[in-house]
Amino acid sequence: MNCVVIPAYRAAGSILSVIEAVGPEIELIVVVDDGCPEGTGVVVANRCSDPRVVTLMHDANQGVGGAFLTGMRYAIVRGADIIIKVDADGQMDPAQVPALIHPIASGQADYVKGDRFFFLTNSASMPPVRRFGNLALSFLAKLSSGYWTIMDPTNGFFAIHARVAELLDDERIAKRFFFETDLLFHLGLIRAKVVEFPMRASYGNEVSNLRVSHQLGPFLAGHMRNTTRRILYRYFFRDLSLASLQLVAGGVLFLFGLVFGLYHWWAAPPDQLVPTGTIMIAALTFLMGFQLVLSFLNYDISASPREPLHPFLKGWQAKAADEGRNAAASYVAPERVRREA
């Protein structure tokens, strides 16, 4: 079963048209009203007659990530196989869902996300501030997630296999604007295969709830934290390889050469030349360290997951899936559930 989850906040004017555009390949549509002051969930419950639609209500706003994770958990207990996130503002075309989920349905990927940078004309139509921010965040996301071929990390149009979703520690995933990027980091920890889907986004008159000045600090802090956690977990806790030694030795030599060279350059009298031996020590250690760090990065880039994970999870998760389906009828959550035809 395929399920679409639509986090909804201040989307009362667009949500019905988004639901109407969802094709017949989707058996379940979960709309999560994330404490919307416009009552988007009430609008859906009272005015939408689509029998596939279920509305979940958050009493308080939890962010786009919190809303999706609520819908994801509900979809899993309902027995969904593939879970798709579609935003409620109409920026994403639900008609593209069949192409989006094809790599997962055919066993080629665990997670598929949209890429708005694939088409140059579409990228040029992106607002300049948004384009620059996404390009900068793309590089940081490569470093923090380990998916070096992935662009557009903040794209919210994605699909994930339910078996892989069950492996995620959703309590530790960021709930607000860092959600999509943090999700990539957690997918990297379990070595899920991620591929991109070329898409065209529509930038209309919708008003973004993102305030760049407020989120810049949390985004940078989140990337630094995730980069540190990923490297420690991947190269020191889970495994110890030549790349681990390259990183340690390279980091030590690089920093030693840099600090040693700067110190002697600063401390040298202006009328005296720095001894050749001192220059050689600083230069050689700096260059050796730099080369070792480059070797580590080359290994890290080549180590991106290449095999999908979910085909290997079918056996040991079968029992859990049966229990989930049995629990669907008595699903209890801190959110109110409303369904009206």
Q: What positions do the PLM features span?
A:
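Cell-envelope/extracellular polymer assembly enzymes that use nucleotide-activated donors
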Residues: 2-3, 182
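Short, well-formed alpha-helical segments that are part of the catalytic scaffolds
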Residues: 6-24
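Hydrophobic helical membrane-anchoring modules
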Residues: 173-174, 178-341
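A conserved acidic beta->alpha catalytic loop
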Residues: 33-42, 60, 90
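Acidic helix N-cap motif at the loop->helix transition within catalytic regions
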Residues: 13-17, 38-47
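Short hydrophobic beta-strand elements that form part
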Residues: 3-7, 30, 57
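Acceptor/aglycone-binding surface of glycosyltransferases and processive sugar-polymer synthases
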Residues: 54, 58-77, 82, 94-177, ...
